[in-house]
């Protein structure tokens, strides 16, 4: 750029070089919209359910606009729960089934939607480990979920495949302790 500037200057054309810094407001919370009475949701929700196949379905109020929101949500969920990325299916944009939110607006997907997905994923993992503990007659704290398998938390030894856990929880609850409730669909909302 400097060489081009100098060449133009030699011909009597004066151009400079400039630098501009800009900060865009993103992920505004309730105080931003609520005080003005705008009917704009400043929170977002996420629902994740474990299918009997061991795969996860994630419903979120944020939407994909070409900036990778679906992939980001899938990565957050896979990491929070302890499954492979390819085992997470993200569904967006269906207001009949997804938790209430206000979409992406191109700059709030990760900040609000990603946090809702993280909180939901952590809660689902906790519930999955409770089911696994009931199946394995163990304690939830002695187990972990890694790459879609319930493992011994101390040794990493595989104890139960997530698909088998799903099969038992959905189709053989009679083999679980009396009055045990498998909560394998979780919804959480995040308000910044």
Residue spans for each PLM region:
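Short acidic capping loops at alpha-helix termini that bridge into adjacent secondary structure
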Residues: 84-89, 141
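Cofactor-centric catalytic regions
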Residues: 1-57, 65-80, 93-192
């Amino acid at each position: 750029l400097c060489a081009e500037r100098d060449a133009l200057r030699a011909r009597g054309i004066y151009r400079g070089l400039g630098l501009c810094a800009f900060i865009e407001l993103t992920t505004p919370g309730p105080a931003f919209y609520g005080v003005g009475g705008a009917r704009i949701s400043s929170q977002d929700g996420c629902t994740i359910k474990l299918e009997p196949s061991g795969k996860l379905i994630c419903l979120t109020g944020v939407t994909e606009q070409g900036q990778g929101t679906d992939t980001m949500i899938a990565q957050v969920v896979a990491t929070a729960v302890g499954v492979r990325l390819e085992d997470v299916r993200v569904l967006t944009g269906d207001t009949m089934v997804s938790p209430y939110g206000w979409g992406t607006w191109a700059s709030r997907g990760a900040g609000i939607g990603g946090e809702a997905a993280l909180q939901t994923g952590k809660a689902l993992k906790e519930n999955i480990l409770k089911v696994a503990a009931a199946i394995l007659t163990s304690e939830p704290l002695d187990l972990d979920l890694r790459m879609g398998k319930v493992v011994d938390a101390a040794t990493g030894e595989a104890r139960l495949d997530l698909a088998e856990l799903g099969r038992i929880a959905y189709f053989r609850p009679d083999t679980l302790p009396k009055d045990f409730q498998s909560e394998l669909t979780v919804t959480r909302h995040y308000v910044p």
